Amino acid sequence: MRLWSGSSIWLERRPVTAEVASSSLVRIAILKENMTSQIALIFFNLLIVGVIFTHLLLTTPVVFKSLDEASAANFLRSIFPRYYLLIIILSLPVLLILFLYEPSGTLKWLAANVSFHAVLGFLLIPLTNAAKDRGWDKVFSFAHGMSVYCTIVILALSLIQFFLYIG
């Protein structure tokens, strides 16, 4: 019996066989798994973006306006390791999901680069602090510039991933 017809689509009512039912259940299970993975990927990338925006727009300006130079330096020395560790922790589920479920190399490359730049930013912290303490202005400028570069790359790649997942 025909239920509806359009210009090129015909829907028919057919009895459900065991084969059709089992294949439909498998498709539903795969769809739920893919949807859950996609939601997790979107969630973790947006968390990374949120951490960066919070740090750039709220934390840093307030620190320099509210604290003297020595207190600001102490605060930033304690916050930056936590900042990069949080980004590393948030990037790991993205890597895990993509390496388990995603055949595309592009998404894996993007996620690996987010994690790599977070680790690089974390590893630059001792160099940045030592350069500042010893008055090595060129080394400090380079290390600080690399830290800013890492943050920009992480932000850009996380936003790219977000738009790829929702697109």
What is each PLM-predicted segment?
Residues 1, 7-9, 22:
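Short, positively charged low-complexity motifs
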Residues 2, 13-14, 27:
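Basic polycationic patches enriched in arginine
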Residues 6-8, 12, 138:
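Intrinsic disorder/low-complexity segments enriched in polar/charged and small flexible residues
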Residues 10, 17, 29-31, 167:
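Residues marking helix boundaries in flexible regions
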Residues 23-34:
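Short, Lys/Arg-enriched N-terminal segments with co-localized hydrophobic residues
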Residues 34-167:
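Polytopic transmembrane helical bundles with strong interfacial aromatic enrichment
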